A protein has these predicted regions:
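Conserved ABC ATPase signature
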Residues: 139-143, 147
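Catalytic Walker B motif of ABC-type/P-loop ATPase nucleotide-binding domains
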Residues: 164-167
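A short, proline-enriched helix->beta-strand linker immediately N-terminal to the Walker B motif
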Residues: 158-162
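Helix-to-loop junction immediately C-terminal to a conserved catalytic motif
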Residues: 50
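Helix N-cap at the start of a conserved alpha-helix in ABC-type nucleotide-binding domains
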Residues: 175-177
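ABC ATPase NBD coupling module
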Residues: 67-86
Length: 222
């Protein structure tokens, strides 16, 4: 069963097409790496799936929720989208004035309306699961690149989305940390998560992904 189904997706920047006619299905528990040079549309595909950039044409279906061309998702559609999709950005985008733990439980309180005590308990469990439980009270500036990334993954997973999107996850990691990240993503996939990862890192894609898509000039070339 496909968690993500993209059909004839187009994304534009002004008058310029940055994504052209992309179609892909991703199954539950599958890791798909999207590769290509800078400017080929990798990140734009992820941002359209996440509802950050508008869809110019085509459709995106995530676990039964369909997005189509038009304005960005709002209201109940946006809330449903946030329950289905978590995104880890290249530079993590953690809130610098909040602890690692607070960064993770925030969405549980504001999106799922959980009591703060319950949200903190779940957030601690996620941080422990990802190997950074001892950094729960650290501020983002006190975290290493690998630690910050794991906190960002925990935050993206907090509301239990079936789909996780990652943009250039190895950019700030040394080779050892890249291997650890690949193992973490494989573990998440074995637990039933579906992952789509935009990356320049061919070795990481080979080790981590079940399938690799190559993008050229906004299209899936192979």
């Amino acid at each position: 069963m496909s968690v993500l189904a993209v059909r004839d997706l187009e994304v534009r920047r002004g008058l310029r097409h940055v994504v052209r006619g992309v179609s892909v299905d991703v199954s539950r528990g599958e890791i798909v790496a999207v590769m290509g040079a800078s400017g080929t549309g990798k990140t734009s595909v992820l941002r359209a799936v996440a509802g950050i950039d508008p869809i110019a044409a085509g459709t995106v279906a995530i676990d039964g929720l369909q997005l189509s061309a038009g304005p960005l998702p709002r209201g109940e559609t946006l809330r449903q989208l946030h329950r289905r999709v978590g995104m880890v950005f290249q530079f993590h985008h953690l809130f610098e004035h909040l602890t690692a733990l607070h960064n993770v439980w925030l969405a549980l309180v504001h999106v799922q309306r959980q009591p703060q005590a319950d949200a903190e308990k779940k957030a601690r469990a996620l941080l422990e699961h990802l190997g950074v439980g001892d950094r729960a009270d650290a501020m983002p500036r006190e975290l290493s690149g690998g630690e910050a990334q794991r906190v960002a993954i925990a935050r993206a997973l907090a509301v239990g989305p079936p789909l996780l999107l990652m943009d250039e996850p190895t950019a700030s990691l040394d080779p050892a940390r890249r291997g650890e990240l690949a193992a973490t993503l494989r573990q998440l996939a074995s637990e039933g998560r579906t992952l789509v990862v935009a990356t320049h890192d061919e070795e990481f894609a080979r080790v981590c992904a079940h399938r690799v898509l190559i993008m050229e000039e906004g299209r899936v070339a192979r």
